[in-house]
A protein has these predicted regions:
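Acidic, glycine-rich active-site loops and adjacent beta-strand->loop/helix elements
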Residues: 84-89, 114-120, 159, 225-227
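N-terminal glycine-rich anion-binding loops that anchor highly charged ligand groups
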Residues: 1-3, 9-57, 65-74, 293
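Short glycine-rich or small-residue beta-strand-to-loop segments that form or flank ligand, phosphate
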Residues: 12, 43-47, 81-86, 301
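Glycine-rich anion-binding loops and their surrounding alpha/beta cores
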Residues: 2-3, 7-10, 17, 62-68, ...
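Active-site cofactor/substrate anionic-group-binding motifs, chiefly glycine-
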Residues: 50-114
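Short amphipathic alpha-helical face segments that pack within enzyme cores
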Residues: 41, 98-102, 293, 297-300
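N-terminal small/glycine-rich loop or linker at the start of catalytic domains
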Residues: 2-14, 79-85, 111
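A glycine-rich phosphate/pyrophosphate-binding beta-strand-loop-alpha-helix module
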Residues: 43, 93-149
């Protein structure tokens, strides 16, 4: 019996694994060392007692190591992602992805990592593709797009081939596992900042602790009154990370300089509908609720990357870029260059 197999047996007996032990087991999973029954038993045992932050961080670490290389110089820095865990079942427009495009138009380098929809009607990949940005760019082409436009989309299926070992298990279990949590933590790009939304407020501290292991300069973990976004219908619970230091506070729409809306005001549809709604916002003809929700999320990206001193300042900067057409024209540039690189 290998050491990883012995450690897996400990987890099945209810032992909470240290981060190094958990890395050992998850690394073995990425290498195909366990069969589906062993993987299912392990994931079920973790979920039954509750995944420990060290185990969440370990799973993310193992799958980042196993990911396809994204050839962006690690020492160059300045990359950010804005992403949510999903699971809030609210059916909103793709706020995070839209906000990534706003931030890119303002000089931020956004390496957006995402996948197709699983439980929602429109995943980040579905929206990006519908907007006209191809998903088949090579890692080298994605770096080129990032350098020239400040945006690239890293399609999770392309960068995480090791997920093939757990995909059948996840489909068969039909229950949440640690893999529902690590999607936002396994971006293959060398991030220095991140905005991470969680759909379950109970995950705020665990995800903040896991993110603290990623050696980021600045990050926000947010839960907005039932959404994995900054809320405009109620308060948002925030965990702000600067290095390994975590600060907790509450944020209201008024503090952002925005009005309040209902969750129903933010509901979208499938990727085609959401693309139309988001394009309308960028063209100055969209709904105010959509515009303000996107601006709030973009403000968080501007804040963690040092492009805004406060979240409220970031909101105003984002709103101005939307209003004056900067975002719409920049999206056209991204689409054009991405298609050229894909050809």
């Amino acid at each position: 019996m290998s050491q990883a197999a012995a450690t897996l047996r400990e987890a099945l007996n209810g032992v909470v694994l240290s981060q190094s032990q958990a890395v050992e087991v998850f690394a073995a999973i990425t290498n195909g060392e366990f069969n589906e029954i062993e993987i299912a038993a392990f994931l079920g045992a973790l979920h039954a007692r509750g995944e420990d932050p060290a185990e969440i961080a370990a799973a993310a670490q193992a799958f980042r190591v196993a990911a396809v290389n994204f050839p962006y110089p690690k020492g160059q820095g300045g990359l950010v992602d804005v992403v949510g865990t999903g699971g809030d079942r609210a059916g909103t427009i793709n706020i995070s992805t839209a906000s990534a495009l706003v931030a890119a138009s303002l000089g931020v380098k956004v390496a957006k990592h995402g996948n197709r929809a699983v439980s929602s009607r429109s995943g980040a990949a579905d929206l990006v593709e519908t907007l006209g940005i191809p998903l088949d760019l090579s890692p080298q082409a994605s770096v080129q797009l990032l350098e020239s436009t400040g945006f690239c989309f890293l399609f999770a299926q392309k960068y995480h081939p090791a997920m093939r070992y757990v995909a059948p298990v996840r489909a068969a279990l039909k229950n949440p596992t640690v893999f529902n949590l690590i999607g936002p933590l396994v971006n293959p790009a060398p991030l220095s900042a991140q905005v991470l939304g969680v759909g379950n407020p109970a995950l705020l501290d665990d995800m903040a602790s896991a993110l603290a292991s990623a050696n980021l300069d600045h990050a926000l973990v947010v839960h907005g009154s039932g959404l994995d976004e900054i809320a405009l219908h109620g308060p948002t619970q925030v965990r702000e990370l600067r290095g390994a230091e975590i600060t907790a506070y509450e944020l209201t729409p008024a503090q952002l300089g925005l009005g309040t809306y209902t969750v129903a005001d933010l509901v979208g549809g499938d990727a085609s509908v959401n693309a139309q709604l988001i394009r309308a916002v960028f063209d100055g003809a969209g709904q105010a609720a959509h515009r303000d929700a996107i601006a709030a999320s973009a403000a968080a990206v501007l804040y963690v990357t040092g492009k805004a001193d406060t979240l409220a300042q970031g909101v105003q900067t984002a709103l101005e870029a939307i209003a004056n057409g900067t975002v719409a024209s920049h999206l056209d540039k991204i689409v054009t260059q991405a298609r050229e690189l894909s050809a």
